[in-house]
Amino acid sequence: MEEIFPGVYKENGNLYTKDENLEPWNPFVSKPAAAILKGLKNFPLRKGMKILYLGAAHGTTVAHFSNILGEGIIYAVEFSSKVIQKLLEKAKNKENIVPLLEDARFPENYGWIGKIDLIYEDIAQRDQILILKRNSVFLKKDGYFMLALKAKAIDSVRDVKEIYSEALKELSKNFEILETINLEPYEKDHLFILGKNSKH
């Protein structure tokens, strides 16, 4: 078994993170796992980081991030009071997860979370880019973001490549784009974007 990034392991084409035991990281469920298997060169999560996770859902990917971070902290934002219940269950066993029942479009409502090392966003809404920009007020200079961009949530009719191109152009106004990965066959019409807050 090879440790391909700190806290991320690969064996026979499968990914794992480690809590007390190795936990399989499914690329068909978790977009960062898909991006890694598609050849992502840089995966900036490190032990001790503070992460703002937008669109935490049931907490599957949050739990893997938790394994990697160790004594770091994840502020896990989820808007649905129904969906967040599973996340709350996971957080009981993982001290570094802080669930926030909030709307990611309004980061001013989170309360004090301080400066963040990395923002991860997986929110299938038309204003995905704007949500990232609004939340970047918490991002440290030279902090990272990872965005799982869902093209059809932005526009269900237009050409996907056109949507990607416009999104990257818009993001480039505020951030340095480091890598882009098309997530097919794991996710249709998704572009995984890694960037850095080096323009502030």
Q: Where in the sequence are the language-model features?
A:
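N-terminal auxiliary segments of SAM/dcSAM-dependent transferases
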Residues: M1-W25
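Conserved alpha-helix/loop element of class I SAM-dependent methyltransferases that forms part
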Residues: E2, P27-K50
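Residue-level signature of catalytic and energy-coupling elements of molecular machines
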Residues: I36, G55, I119, G195
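Helix-to-beta-strand junctions that scaffold the AdoMet/dcAdoMet cofactor pocket
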Residues: R46, L69-G70, F138-D142
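Conserved class I S-adenosyl-L-methionine
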Residues: R46-A57, I73-Y75
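S-adenosyl-L-methionine
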Residues: V77-D127
